[in-house]
Amino acid sequence: MMELIKQLPHIEPYGNPQYFLYVITAILPIFIGLFFKKRFGWYEILVSLFFIVTMLTGGKTNQLAALGIYLIWQMVLVLFYKQYRKVRDGKWIFYLVSLLSLLPIIFVKVQPAINGTQSLLGFVGISYLTFRSVGIIIELRDGVIKDLKMWEYLRFLLFMPTFSSGPIDRFKRFNENYKTIPERDELLDMLAESVRYIMWGFLYKFILAHILGEILLPPLKNLALQTGGVFNYYVVAIMYTFGFELFFDFAGYSMFAIAISNLMGIRSPINFNKPFLSRDLKEFWNRWHMSLSFWFRDFVFMRMVMVMTRKKLFKNRNVTSSVAYVLNMLLMGFWHGITWFYIAYGLFHGIGLVMNDAWVRKKKTLNKERKKAGRPPFPENRWIQLLGMVITFHVVMVSFLIFSGFLNDLWFKK
């Protein structure tokens, strides 16, 4: 059996146009079944497993074995906590189970930073499965999830279109969506949306991201390294080129994932909503990698604020929210990887959000003072909004330069 699995080709999800020929052919019966108000549950499982297996194999089975161990580990934790939550609500058991659920991703992220080798527990998609697993544990405690069947749990974790890189869904929304087969008119709308997303995704990922990342970026990096110094003009070009390449690559991927989800009768959450039109950093995080930022907002930021408020760690609520912003974004930086530039990226955005909130509060105070003095408030016309967009865009691009890791090559690798 293992030899047969080893002989399977490696098929990178959404890695090339040929992938869509395979996946659309495979899920066409699913869409036809939905059109006639039928879900072919076992066929869906087989399709998902086939594409996940080929995603993780290609001569080796270590990633597949890691996935199997991971699923058993998470299932044991969720089963235990589901039964425990029916009779008790101890916070320390909740913290312990959440930590144990996070252990695999902690090992995967920390090991390369310690000895430079990849963890045997790692596999494509482990980060996004962890968000789903921990999210379920949190929602079991909150009472959002009243009942959880293991086959529904596995179906949620192993949903093929979003397995490798999201978008990050929530169990309750996904499960309710799965159980409700769309009406024919809605299904046809989802088909039209899928075609549109796939076309835009081809433009974003296979044309624009390819031009920026494969054609323009390498020579710019070489020129910047040859020029040397702490900073040079080529670094500015790298900043914008990488920033747009990152957006087009990931936004294109997200469009593909949503399109294939639609064809399987599931409306996965959108990930990007014109992020470069944001007027401030807070709005940016409501438009950029939305399923990730909303996950951190709901399950990390809001809970830190509640805990710090309940324990009265700070007298001022603005200080509480500021500390939560920084810790939340630092944690997001660590999630990307244990390197100084990912951590600096998180800290950069954490401080940026603190400054953003401080300016909003300051502007409100100044407007009140101006009103008392009989003067008009600061203008909020389209030109001011445009200025906010321009400033936010460039601040974000600076953060993407940090995120790219190129400054590490420029400053420390000789």
Where are these regions (language model features)?
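Membrane-embedded transmembrane alpha-helical bundles that form the catalytic cores
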Residues: 2-414
